[in-house]
Amino acid sequence: YPSIINILPSVNKFGGAGKNFYRLIKDVDLENYDYICFSDQDDIWYKDKIKNAIDCLVFNNANCYSSNVIAYYPSGQKNLVDKAQSQTQFDYFFEAAGPGCTYVIKKETLIEFKKFIINNKNAAQDICLHDWFLYSFARTRNYSWYIDRKPTMLYRQHENNQVGANISFKAKYKRLGLVRNKWYQKEVTKIANALADDSFVNNQLGKGYIGNLILALSFWKLRRKKADKIYILLMLILNIF
């Protein structure tokens, strides 16, 4: 369908989903579309996924949309991945708005993000997770974001998932490793620095254990899920973050 499908020329391998999506956002002409959806090749969308997302955007007068998903495994196991807890003051520094493959963004918002990553090429390319970065960009620029409790797709889990659903013990152990080796802290810091956000969180980053303790005083503002609020509190107090 050459009239509706535009295939971009092949370029060098980028080595991760983030840089691939940054390339797509920069190279695709967004002006002819009202909404832009991110997609992974190995997930299964529900038939009403896009309609449901646009209906939610219109009804809630929001700029950006994401949703819960159903993680599914080669064994046939399925689990709800719930990311639709209430947004907090600073959650965007510490997590995405759900899997990026559920994102549906109004054209005007993504065009602004496109301008940002073009004008801040080095900083943007250094941030691993495009979906987390886009959520942070939107929140710091006061674009409204709606996270839907309704699952809109099957989110396939396999060994090559860059992040994954974080449900199994193995997945949680892998995430803990990313915290302990400071990958997580570095990504938070890179996002805060790239966005030049002069917030409470950014002002504590890089201040060592004292900064962690100050962040711990506002731990309930840093994540959405109750359990994750406790996890980050412990990470800060124990100086694992």
Regions found by a protein language model. Give the residues of each.
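Nucleotide-sugar donor-binding/catalytic module of glycosyltransferases
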Residues: Y1-F169
